[in-house]
Amino acid sequence: MIVGVLALQGGVEEHLTALEALGATTRKVRVPKDLDGLEGIVIPGGESTVLDKLARTFDVAEPLANLIRDGLPVFATCAGLIYLAKHLDNPARGQQTLELLDVVVRRNAFGTQRESFDTTVDVSFDGATFPGVQASFIRAPIVTAFGPTVEAIAALNGGEVVGVRQGNIIALSFHPEETGDYRIHQAWLNLIGKRTELAI
């Protein structure tokens, strides 16, 4: 199984470490040819406006979007969630997204870097529940609204939606890769494995 990590900026190495610890073969994705033969891709956290600009600069945005539309499994964290969203409450000037995930997202919903925090979050999808996932919220977004094809899979005690699934897309506001809690990475890899088996 070959899975990619969009390696334009942000928390690339942490996701590579998680995936490789779980036995996946990984590839850094920077240009369109890096997408060839992937069975899944991670869009990591970082700075969503920089991610957008670099993806367009390296001509990877459009082929990536096309593959996701065609069903390529995606796991996105923090800025990755923002980058997939159809709508942003508070976009930066000129900011573009892939507009693939039917959600409204508020950037930096908890404030600045100083207001970053760690907590635990219960995550549920594909018939499984992962209690107490160790989650790092770093200038994190939240989902303020979502369409009928989107399922909320994680929320904070105050009701803020911090994880969603839409078909082949799983997106979280937080960073499990920063905490060493790799259960969601493993569950995502399991979903890819099931998809591959069905395709055989």
UniProtKB/Swiss-Prot annotation:
InterPro entries: Class_I_gatase-like, PdxT/SNO, PdxT/SNO_CS. L-glutamine binds at residues 46-48, 107, 138-139. Pathway: Cofactor biosynthesis; pyridoxal 5'-phosphate biosynthesis. It comes from the Bacteria. PROSITE patterns: PDXT_SNO_1 (PS01236), PDXT_SNO_2 (PS51130). This is Pyridoxal 5'-phosphate synthase subunit PdxT. It catalyses: aldehydo-D-ribose 5-phosphate + D-glyceraldehyde 3-phosphate + L-glutamine = pyridoxal 5'-phosphate + L-glutamate + phosphate + 3 H2O + H(+); L-glutamine + H2O = L-glutamate + NH4(+). CDD domains: GATase1_PB. GO terms for cellular component: cytosol; glutaminase complex. GO terms for molecular function: glutaminase activity; pyridoxal 5'-phosphate synthase (glutamine hydrolysing) activity. NCBIfam families: PLP_synth_Pdx2. Catalyzes the hydrolysis of glutamine to glutamate and ammonia as part of the biosynthesis of pyridoxal 5'-phosphate. The resulting ammonia molecule is channeled to the active site of PdxS. The active site is at 78 (nucleophile), 175 (charge relay system), 177 (charge relay system). Pfam families: SNO. Belongs to the glutaminase PdxT/SNO family. GO terms for biological process: glutamine catabolic process; pyridoxal phosphate biosynthetic process; pyridoxine metabolic process. Its EC number is 4.3.3.6, 3.5.1.2. In the presence of PdxS, forms a dodecamer of heterodimers. Only shows activity in the heterodimer. Keywords: Glutamine amidotransferase, Hydrolase, Lyase, Pyridoxal phosphate.
